């Protein structure tokens, strides 16, 4: 059992978002798509978490700029 299987994140309801934070995430994902794709397909739980996060972040009220470093850490 890996440590991240016990890891649980509970996010507060969405609050707000700027257009710049969406651009930051898009840039991270576009920089090295093949590497990120390989990482995520090899780790289905991370893929599901990212899919859920991206679905939530489409709500423009969600401030996720503070999560940029965490997204970068998880994807590398």
Swiss-Prot record:
The keyword Disulfide bond applies. It comes from the Viruses. Late protein which probably participates in disulfide bond formation by functioning as a thiol-disulfide transfer protein between membrane-associated OPG072 and OPG08. The complete pathway for formation of disulfide bonds in intracellular virion membrane proteins sequentially involves oxidation of OPG072, OPG128 and OPG08. Disulfide bonds join 17-21. Keywords: Disulfide bond, Late protein, Redox-active center. Interacts with sulfhydryl oxidase OPG072; this interaction involves formation of a transient disulfide-bonded intermediate, allowing disulfide bond transfer. Interacts with OPG088; this interaction involves formation of a transient disulfide-bonded intermediate, allowing disulfide bond transfer. Belongs to the orthopoxvirus OPG128 family. It comes from Vaccinia virus (strain Copenhagen) (VACV). This is Protein OPG128. Induction: Expressed in the late phase of the viral replicative cycle.
């Amino acid at each position: 059992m890996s440590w991240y299987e016990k890891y649980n994140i509970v996010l507060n309801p969405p609050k707000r978002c700027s257009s710049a934070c969406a651009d930051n995430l898009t840039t991270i994902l576009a920089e090295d798509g093949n590497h990120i794709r390989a990482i995520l397909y090899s780790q289905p739980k991370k893929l599901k978490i990212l899919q859920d996060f991206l679905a939530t972040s489409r709500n423009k009220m969600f401030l996720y700029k503070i999560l940029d470093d965490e997204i970068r850490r998880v994807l590398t």
